[in-house]
Design a protein with these regions (language model features):
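Generic beta-strand structural signal
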Residues: 58, 133-134, 206
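Active-site nucleotide/adenylate-binding loops and adjacent lid/helix of ATP-dependent enzymes
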Residues: 21, 31-127, 179-185
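Hydrophobic residue at the +6 position relative to the catalytic HRD Asp in the kinase catalytic loop
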Residues: 202-204
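Phosphate-binding site of ATP-dependent enzymes
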Residues: 90-195
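Protein kinase-like catalytic core scaffold
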Residues: 76, 116, 139-140, 200, ...
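C-terminal active-site "lid" helix and adjoining low-complexity regulatory extension at the edge
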Residues: 179, 193-197, 206-236
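A short, GP-enriched loop/loop-strand-helix hinge that lies immediately N-terminal to
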Residues: 1-37, 52-55
Length: 236
């Protein structure tokens, strides 16, 4: 829906369920789609596989949003349960800033009526890591310069190729990491296998004390051709 196709998820769900009933070969089934369009379900899976994630609450109206925000004593963010490209993610230093936003004319509700409130993880440098999986197995990890905000879509149409990003040593917004190791990769692979997901990109942010906080499972993942060309690795 964030790319101008409001009912694409609903139509795709019907198609996938029909194909499943016909026992057709499917890469990323209807369960993969369920996770793609619900961050609430993603959190449930992360919890099930004991993957660390930011403190998170869910709200279904403005009153609940303000009430749940009282659980935070430090900066936090709000995001839509059905998101996409980081659109709709807002940063707040305190409940008073949130109250002005929620009661103002610029408030933007989630398309499914569910809003997440999540602790803000401060990182230095301002980067996140996206781990790509193909056939349910680790392929590579890409470091993403997040200094410009939360819209971190890796697809080529989303990016200005000649923009220099200082957080990555090669100057590109997306940089594939060499000799990458992460003890949670096995947990990620187990989670994907349990849900019948073959292709995915899982994102986490590392806090200043080195703790990993996983916050997103992308089952409609994209690849960045510049980063892949520089590393000689390909997702497709």
């Amino acid at each position: 829906h964030s790319r101008g196709h409001r009912y694409a998820p609903e139509n795709t769900k019907n198609l996938l369920e029909w194909l499943e009933k016909e026992n057709r070969r499917i890469v990323n089934n209807s369960r993969a789609l369920e996770l793609e369009i619900s961050k609430q379900k993603q959190i449930e899976e992360l919890k099930k596989f004991e993957v660390n994630f930011p403190k998170t609450y869910f709200a279904v109206n403005k009153k609940e949003i303000l009430e749940k925000s009282k659980n935070f004593s430090k900066p936090f963010i709000t995001k839509h349960n059905r998101g996409g490209r980081g659109l709709g993610v807002k940063y707040f230093q305190n409940i008073y800033e949130l109250k002005r936003y929620v009661n103002g004319k610029n408030f933007e509700d989630s398309i499914d009526g569910i809003t997440l409130l999540q602790e803000y993880i401060d990182s230095d440098p301002k980067v996140i890591t996206r781990i790509e999986f193909v056939k349910g197995k680790f392929l590579y990890a890409v470091q993403v310069d997040a200094s410009d905000g939360f819209e971190l879509c890796p697809a080529d149409p989303c990016n200005v190729q000649d923009k220099f990003c200082p957080a990555n040593s090669d100057g590109n917004k997306f940089m594939i990491l060499k000799d990458y190791k992460n003890p949670e990769i096995k947990k990620y692979e187990d989670l994907l296998k349990s849900n019948g997901i073959e292709i995915a990109g899982i994102e986490y942010v590392k806090s200043k004390d080195g703790t990993h906080y996983t916050y997103d499972i992308n089952t409609n993942t994209n690849y960045n051709s510049i980063a892949e060309r520089k590393s000689n690795l390909k997702g497709m």
